[in-house]
Every structure is written in structure tokens, then in C-alpha cells.
């Protein structure tokens, strides 16, 4: 689990993906502090080097919102995000609803989410006030397992 001392690494990870299209707003240091207080943030490491992060917020006992997933470009395409999401879904096996938001053009992420049981629930225009639409995805694997 990440802590305030990990904020520089979290900022650096976000900057590392800035060369590619950014599908969500980048957080500043004070926003990372808030994120750490309201939810869980995990630093993904390989050989003690930060290579990504995953953050989520428990909205209620039955609802978790995955607020962020970043993998350093040097480690993308190696199954890092898949492995981390599978572990998270196992950890949250008793949660009835797990959802996340992604850009409709983020085909790699969308394919990953759908392969793990997420379905598109709705499309929201101008979701973060940036003029861009987002897709709200919900994990049906969790919903079906808790019926």
C-alpha cells in the first residue's frame, strides 16, 4: 500500500505516461494526499522499482470504485495490469459492485477490462469537465457471483 512518502513516485509514474494520450486527469501532490486519505493506493513494484499504481475507493460495503491504474510504458504489454486487477478482484470477492471509468478510445484498457468480466454500463459525456466522454464499466463477474 502506498503512503505519503510514495507521492514523488506516483507523480513520476503519471509523468511517464504523459507521452502517450492521457485518458484521465493527472493528479498533483496535494490531490494524491487526498486520494491516499479517501481510498487505497498501491504502488506496483518490480525489483523494488515503482512500475505502476492502482487506486480504488470503497464507496460503501457493497461498492468499490477503481479510480486509477497506471503502468509505466516500459512495462506495458507484459500482463502487469491484468495481474494486478485479478488480485484486486480476488481481494474484493465479497463486494457486490466494482466499477471504473475509461475513455472510449482507450482500446487496450477496454479490452483488458472486458476480458476480466467488466461490461460497459453507460457513456457519460464531458465526464471530468475536459470535453471528453467516458465509459462507466461494471464488473459483471462480481455481480453474477453475488446473486
Indicate where each model-derived feature is located.
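Conserved GNAT acetyl-CoA-binding A-motif
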Residues: 92-104
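Conserved catalytic-core motifs of GNAT/GCN5-like acyltransferases
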Residues: 99-102, 114, 119-136
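Active-site acidic-Proline motif in GNAT/NAT acetyltransferases
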Residues: 72-78, 104-105
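Short glycine/proline-centered loop/turn elements that form peptide/ligand docking sites
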Residues: 81, 85, 105-109, 126-131
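Acetyl-CoA-dependent GNAT
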Residues: 4-7, 11-74, 85-87, 91, ...
Amino acid at each position: 500500500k502506498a503512503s505519503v512518502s510514495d507521492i514523488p513516485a506516483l507523480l513520476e509514474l503519471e509523468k511517464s505516461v504523459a507521452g502517450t494520450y492521457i485518458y484521465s486527469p493527472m493528479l498533483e501532490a496535494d490531490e494524491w494526499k487526498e486520494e491516499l486519505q479517501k481510498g487505497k493506493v498501491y504502488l506496483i513494484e518490480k525489483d523494488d522499482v515503482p512500475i505502476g499504481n492502482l487506486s480504488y475507493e470503497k464507496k460503501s460495503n457493497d461498492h468499490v470504485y477503481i479510480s486509477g491504474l497506471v503502468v509505466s510504458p516500459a512495462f506495458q504489454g507484459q500482463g502487469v495490469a491484468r495481474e494486478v486487477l485479478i488480485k484486486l478482484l480476488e481481494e474484493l470477492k465479497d463486494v457486490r459492485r466494482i466499477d471504473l471509468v475509461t475513455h472510449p478510445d482507450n482500446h487496450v484498457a477496454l479490452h483488458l477490462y472486458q476480458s476480466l468480466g467488466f461490461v460497459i454500463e453507460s457513456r457519460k459525456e464531458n465526464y471530468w469537465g475536459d470535453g471528453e466522454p467516458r465509459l462507466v464499466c461494471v464488473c459483471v463477474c462480481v455481480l453474477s457471483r453475488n446473486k
